[in-house]
Regions:
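Glycine-rich beta-alpha loop elements in corrinoid/cobalamin-binding modules
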Residues: 1-167
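Conserved small/polar residues in nucleotide/adenosyl-binding loops
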Residues: 171-175
């Protein structure tokens, strides 16, 4: 987004880079930065959030690659994704980490996504990544479920199988 226009033309400036210079940040910055953190600090929990992470929390269509990509949690290798505005999630997470909580306990927070080896039985199951990446109707079905479950009053947890043994689970903000 920060490097190209919708017409895939290169932007010459970047309002969020030092001096407004373009191309100071990598494409898919969240994925690149998480991979660099993993190289330097193998076992450190990585928490991601913001617009890029929020919009790519489930399997999603990537305009630049013209294909459906996995959740950004899979691609980045991050431990936890905080979506939406994240004001309460980041404070709660910081308090948990400061208190020495195990990162495995963090998935109990609201407004987050995490990976697990088994699907949460209370989740609304979305079509799997394999299904949405090969079938347009399944992609549309997954989108409708995601849209419907974003309701702040009646929204439920959602799960989506990403690989044969990994499931993305989303804990709704209103829980």
């Amino acid at each position: 987004v920060n490097h190209y226009t919708v017409a895939k033309k290169r932007r010459h400036d970047d309002a969020y880079a030092p001096g407004g210079k373009g191309f100071m940040r990598p494409d898919r910055a969240t994925i690149v930065y998480c991979n660099r953190i993993r190289q330097a600090y193998r076992d450190v929990p990585i928490l991601i959030g913001g617009v890029e992470a929020s919009l790519r929390r489930f399997s999603h269509y990537d305009y630049w690659d013209d294909k459906v990509r996995h959740s950004i949690l899979v691609d980045s290798g991050a431990t936890l994704l905080m979506y939406g505005m994240g004001e309460t999630s980041i404070i709660e997470c910081a308090n948990w980490v400061a208190d020495g909580m195990n990162p495995a306990e963090l998935p109990k927070m609201r407004g987050i996504c995490y990976m697990s080896k088994t699907p949460d039985p209370t989740c609304v199951q979305l079509p799997s990544h394999q299904e949405v990446s090969t079938d347009k109707r399944k992609y549309a079905e997954a989108f409708v479920i995601q849209y419907d479950e974003q309701d702040p009053i009646r929204g439920k947890r959602m799960c989506q199988q990403q690989d044969t043994d990994r499931y993305l689970s989303l804990i709704h903000i209103s829980e």
